[in-house]
Amino acid sequence: MAFEYPDFVQRVLLHDEALHRPLPTDPPNPEMIIRIREANDDEILPESGLRNLDLLPLLRGGLFYFHDSLTDAIRMVDSVPGALGDYWRQMVFRRMGEFEVARTYGRRAGELPPFQLMLRMAADDSPNMSKQSSWDSYLLAQLYEQYRFGDADLEVELRGLQRVEFDQIYRYTFRQAVGE
């Protein structure tokens, strides 16, 4: 069986302008943010006997994150305890430019199951990440910090890394939420 997100989630993730800026200041598509806010829970995580509603804030927060609405994203992901919630907080705070906070949450999250796949997916396009033995959120925070303080050459690499990271962490979160 092929993996598929619910229709609403698929439509939200189809936007080419999303997730382009490593350090966004505001969402480029405010209408999409409104649609995410107004979506009912079943549009994001369909009803099933195995679904884990505790992870729903991460899924909705992930959609906000994807569309650069980081304030909305942190409001959602902040309520979820555990390693996966910590990793999402790390992702959001890093893109907000709160690098020390991001590193702290990254350390708390530890290593998650998708990390080896993420490393393999990113290795060809990221000279920095390819030197690591596993996906390294601490290194990623350092690269974002370098970018923020003037290393514009990192932008393309960071865009690729954040895309791989988002795709795999969102997918992992969704699979956990549906009981796979």
Regions found by a protein language model. Name each.
Residues M91-R94, A109-G110, M121:
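Hydrophobic alpha-helical segments of small multi-pass membrane proteins
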